[in-house]
Swiss-Prot record:
Its EC number is 3.5.1.16. Homodimer. Binds 2 Zn(2+) or Co(2+) ions per subunit. Belongs to the peptidase M20A family. ArgE subfamily. This is Acetylornithine deacetylase. Zn(2+) 1 binds at residues 79, 111, 168. InterPro entries: AcOrn-deacetyl, ArgE/DapE_CS, Bact_exopeptidase_dim_dom, Peptidase_M20, Peptidase_M20_dimer, Peptidase_M20A. Zn(2+) 2 binds at residues 111, 144, 354. Catalyzes the hydrolysis of the amide bond of N(2)-acetylated L-amino acids. Cleaves the acetyl group from N-acetyl-L-ornithine to form L-ornithine, an intermediate in L-arginine biosynthesis pathway, and a branchpoint in the synthesis of polyamines. Pathway: Amino-acid biosynthesis; L-arginine biosynthesis; L-ornithine from N(2)-acetyl-L-ornithine (linear): step 1/1. It catalyses: N(2)-acetyl-L-ornithine + H2O = L-ornithine + acetate.
Amino acid sequence: MIRKIPSFIEVYKSLIQIPTISSNNKLLDQSNKNFIDLLSNYFSDLNFSVKNYQIPHTDKYNMLACVGSGNGGLLLSGHSDTVDFDEKKWTKDPFKLTETNNKFYGLGAVDMKGFFALILEVISSINIKKINKPIYILATANEETDMSGARNFIQSTIIKPDCIIIGEPTSLKLINAHKGHMSYSIKVIGDTGHSSNPDHGVNSIEIMHDVIRSLLILKKYFKEEYQHPNFSIPYPTMNLSSIHGGSAINRICPLCILNFEIRPIPGLTLTQIEIVIKEKLETIMKKWSHRIFIKKLFSSVPAYECPHNSGTIKIVEKLCQLNSAAVNYCTEAPFLQRIAPTLILGPGSIEQAHQPDEYLEHYFIQPTKNIITKLINKFCY
């Protein structure tokens, strides 16, 4: 017999109050085990079979809950972690769900613990004994950093659902494509000396000037050679995000570091970009091979697209009366897409994600429940 879980509000509160911060700063990074354990208990109480998987060499976990058997079905997916927060900028307790002005406030309220609370609310109100195909619920770790949860999941899972829905905050707009993300750091090492005799040193800023010139040529190349009409910015973008070098006005600069990012469009692979970067920097790298060093800052995320001619898109568009679109931010979709056709559709606005006093507006609640119900009815009954 299915045991009743707490109300939507109580579930939502309990999920928000467990810190699950993911950060590249080890002092801020937290385990998500308590959150995963709680979520697992809720789904177990609803007669789901639940398995938790530890991400190797970490204290982070994925959860896969399943009810029903056979091939196909529906996978509803979200990430368990949140970003860090600046306590000085929050006017409310980040770990206490606060309901006011027709909004739910809290860290992860929209990105994306509210989605799990809504899934549980829907599941608790339907007769899962009558389903013909499985319902899967996936909660991943580390989406906000290296996406190791999703990367690990696709390497080990054997499930093949008919459709995957990632409940990221899209304002309930259907997303079928997004750009990828690559980040690099270039370090130029010079030889210092007194500025009164520039020839007795090697100025790293001057070498970096030539590096930047090559990167700007690459930036122009991306804009001219690659286009995707579904994006508001229809070409791969490059951003020279930060540069640091020098210590004193009368000293030849011995070290200069430039960080930059590239956001590729679908159809342009990570490998292709790496090859082009090497080609554009080849001449200057040969000239200064012992002085120029390039490395990745974070794990790259490929661009993603679920093709418009996919039967899954047509089904979901018709079911939800929505047209699919493309966005510029990244999700776990390019990884989950390797398992089954994947779409992004969830409550709340991406504009509220990663912001002080993060919130989910009330008016998304019932429409989201309706959409989840329709998806389950279509793919599982």
